[in-house]
Amino acid sequence: MNNYISGATTAIITPFKNGTLDEATYANLIQRQIDNNIDAICPVGTTGESATLSHDEHKRCIEIAVEVCKGSNAKVLAGAGSNATHEAIDIAKHAEACGVDALFSVSPYYNKPSQEGLYQHYKAIASAVEVPFMLYNVPGRTGVDILPDTVKRLFDDVWNIMGIKEATGSIERTVELLAKVPDLYVFSGDDSIDFPILASGGKGITSVTANLLPDMKADLTHAALRGDFKTSKAINDELFEINKVLFCESNPIPIKAAMYIAGLIDTLEYRLPLVPPSSENMKKIENVMKKYKIVGA
């Protein structure tokens, strides 16, 4: 399999209007990413509020992403996660039928499977499709960590498992993964450490901040992948403050607020139990956007 995704990918938000998916705005957001050299769109992940979307909404988000990206250089790396394996398989099969380029799947949350359970879960989902497949490890949100030995076992045993989005916040984890699985495609899942992960051998990033600043995230990633670490680090350093502010509350609360302030979405709507930022944090977001001279701030 030689059609792996690498580079800068965006964990796209899901805009709502009057409680429903705002399809027109969603399509516009994706097109903006394409216009700013993002390599792939990642719909219906954590940032896309997948946990509170209906299955029909989840599938529609993927359909729109494929429609908008068709004919462009941008690929679709779609979310197919669930803590019920059969549901994840259903989503994955639908996404494949829509024409996505690859899939990522968050580790099962709440039910906390063992490493053997994680192995069987991912083996079942990836084996149900024939597109490249990425694990998504974010133990701070799911309560379970996909350990490197389990990643290696999956990589060795399942032909289309090609990588992992690593959101442990640990650079050492990336180093360990690549020591054990040199051909693994590791993607940074933490905006503040994109450069260190790329410099350690990572093949890409999946960014929240790219919703707002896709051009800078694309430049950071592409510089690192061509070996221009000086440029990549300089951009990573420049983005450090806004990266931190955009995680002042649970993702995607701050990034959606920032997108609203910037005029990129029409309404600031979340699905309960998520609610808008506190007034104190909203002020932080407004201030950092002014500092970065982002339109609308």
Curated annotation (Swiss-Prot):
Its EC number is 4.3.3.7. GO terms for biological process: diaminopimelate biosynthetic process; lysine biosynthetic process via diaminopimelate. Its main location: cytoplasm. Pathway: Amino-acid biosynthesis; L-lysine biosynthesis via DAP pathway; (S)-tetrahydrodipicolinate from L-aspartate: step 3/4. It is an enzyme of class 4 (lyase). The active site is at Y136 (proton donor/acceptor), K165 (schiff-base intermediate with substrate). It catalyses: L-aspartate 4-semialdehyde + pyruvate = (2S,4S)-4-hydroxy-2,3,4,5-tetrahydrodipicolinate + H2O + H(+). GO terms for cellular component: cytosol. CDD domains: DHDPS. It is found in: Cytoplasm. Keywords: Amino-acid biosynthesis, Cytoplasm, Diaminopimelate biosynthesis, Lyase, Lysine biosynthesis, Schiff base. Pyruvate binds at T47, T206. Homotetramer; dimer of dimers. This is 4-hydroxy-tetrahydrodipicolinate synthase. It comes from Sulfurovum sp. (strain NBC37-1).
